[in-house]
Amino acid sequence: CDAVLATDLPEDPFVADRLVGYFPPLLRERFAERMPTHRLHREIITTEAVNRFVDSQGITAYYRLHLQTGADIAQVIRCQLAARSVFGLGRVETDLTHLGLDAVRTAKIRLALTDLAMHATRWFLNHGGADDIAGTIETYRPGVATLVEKLSERLLGDSADAWQEKVDEVTELGLDRSDAAVVAAYDWSPVLLSIVEISEEGHPLDEVADAYLTLARRVDMIRLTRLVEQLPQDRPTDARVRASLREDLLRVMSDATRRALVIGTDNVLADGGRIVKSIAANPDLAHCVVMVSDLRSAVGQEVTL
């Protein structure tokens, strides 16, 4: 908490409601306007922000994200708050609570939401952070919502089948389709954020999505990402290399998409299928580094680990 207290996070308007929510309802009704002048208002906001982060993300999340990105605790909390709001995770969690499912099924869905938040938080940390939490949400939420809603129409083959299977599984438990689509997006969250990021450079969202997902199918990106995720991370150095490899794969795809918007998808990453098959045949860390380097070479840049 002291590390957060020493930053300007407690002054961010996005977390100001933590102060009022800390007090009992009767005190909120009578003294809400005076609470911002409470002599411990920064300490209260900090404690609430840290507690909510741990409650929603887990006690080891900060350590893992810090190890992978070098970010401090305040940066991690800012990005996690942005990630949760961009994907509307609070709404899904509220709807899930109202369903009253058994502990096992509830935990399964919550785990998917936690994974989604982790992926999206890491993405924001690697793409400039979220110093302006509200501004980041305003930039990304509309595009992400549009993509999540229409993702089933854009995916093909095994990716489409896996997506639909997950959505059907969740809707059968009682969540509506919009909530189920968010739950099913945990694998795709970094991709969706990357698509919105590129569209913010002046390209129509639909065109970016079509180009990115076409290239993703060509290299079987989800399968490749899972192979990277399965690499060992027992030692800190392994974890850092794996995280760098994962991020480099995302950057390869974003760079390839930017090129495809200019020269067409048929002229970008044409050899991607061979590369992903090679990784699948030998999914160890060194081989993945070499193969992702091949992907990087296809768009004219080098892998940086």
Q: Predicted regions span which residues?
A:
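Ligand/cofactor-recognition surfaces for anionic moieties
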Residues: C1-L305
